[in-house]
Amino acid sequence: MVVSLFSSRNVFYTLSLCLFAALYQPVMSRPAKFEDDFRIAWSDTHITQIDGGRAIQLKLDPSSGCGFASKKQYLFGRVSMKIKLIPGDSAGTVTAFYMNSDTDSVRDELDFEFLGNRSGQPYTVQTNVFAHGKGDREQRVNLWFDPSRDFHEYAISWNHLRIVFYVDNVPIRVYKNNEARKVPYPRFQPMGVYSTLWEADDWATRGGIEKINWSRAPFYAYYKDFDIEGCPVPGPADCPANSKNWWEGSAYHQLSPVEARSYRWVRVNHMVYDYCTDKSRFPVPPPECSAGI
């Protein structure tokens, strides 16, 4: 069944979100050229720099996908990119933007995974949080716009108290520090910033029912406005614990009232999967699921 991206009940609120996103500007924004902070990590023949390195193109074809990574790792801060996703029939493809500690079995990881679709269906973004090697915390949201028509900003804000995933400055997920409930929280290992474009038609679209259509290849995704603000590791030893870092300020301890309303709107109208409510996987909800925002 084709799902409409918009419904009459959502139009007014969608316009309100657009106004909020236009008025809000990230603190100390510093968009950079690709080579300032990143390197090609996988298949350099499939990544092309555009506009003097201010934007890049990722390509997926039957021979290979591709990926890039930050030159440094970071412990706390905010990372963001503007991404224009694959248009049309993108079923079976995954465009990922994530942070990863690169520590194998005890890895920490914060994921945005954009799951390709058949033409006319909404794009789904899956988020996941790995802490001390434990993941299985998937949530899925249908985006309320067509992310292939223009660039949209995707950001991860990470401090000692919480992790927030943003789409155009609208929070779509909050993961709190619940170590008091014996829930692991990523606060010891620095993480690099990564992005990949790859084929995953065994699970990405409708659980693997929709397969990739290679006759439409190559598939392209575009990136620009790369922004990393955080404590580099190696770097000043006192940086990660410095409470004066802007991302540790009181404004970033909890969502603002406007953000909280936007977050609830996303969950009510656009969330299509939440591990917290999946009783087949978790008959007893994990303890972090009752933490609220």
Curated annotation (Swiss-Prot):
Record PTM: Contains at least one intrachain disulfide bond essential for its enzymatic activity.
GO annotation (BP), single: xyloglucan metabolic process
Top enzyme class: transferase
Site (Important for catalytic activity): 111
Catalytic-site annotation from UniProt: 109, 113
N-terminal signal peptide: 1-29
SUPFAM superfamilies, A to Z: Concanavalin A-like lectins/glucanases (SSF49899)
Catalytic activity reported: breaks a beta-(1->4) bond in the backbone of a xyloglucan and transfers the xyloglucanyl segment on to O-4 of the non-reducing terminal glucose residue of an acceptor, which can be a xyloglucan or an oligosaccharide of xyloglucan
GO molecular function: hydrolase activity, hydrolyzing O-glycosyl compounds; polysaccharide binding; xyloglucan:xyloglucosyl transferase activity
Protein residues bound to xyloglucan: 113, 126-128, 136-138, 202-203, 207, 281
EC number(s) reported in the record: 2.4.1.207
Xref: Pfam families: Glyco_hydro_16, XET_C
Chain ranges of the GH16 domain: 30-223
Residues bearing glycans: 117, 213
Places the protein is found: Secreted, Cell wall; Secreted, Extracellular space, Apoplast
CC annotations in GO: apoplast
PROSITE patterns: GH16_1 (PS01034), GH16_2 (PS51762)
Keyword terms: Apoplast, Cell wall, Cell wall biogenesis/degradation, Disulfide bond, Glycoprotein, Glycosidase, Hydrolase, Secreted, Signal, Transferase
Disulfide bonds: 231-239, 276-289
Family matches, as InterPro entries: Beta-glucanase/XTH, ConA-like_dom_sf, GH16, GH16_AS, XET_C, XTH
Function noted in UniProt: Catalyzes xyloglucan endohydrolysis (XEH) and/or endotransglycosylation (XET). Cleaves and religates xyloglucan polymers, an essential constituent of the primary cell wall, and thereby participates in cell wall construction of growing tissues.
Homology family: Belongs to the glycosyl hydrolase 16 family. XTH group 1 subfamily.
Protein name: Probable xyloglucan endotransglucosylase/hydrolase protein 7
Organism: Arabidopsis thaliana (Mouse-ear cress)
Primary gene name: XTH7
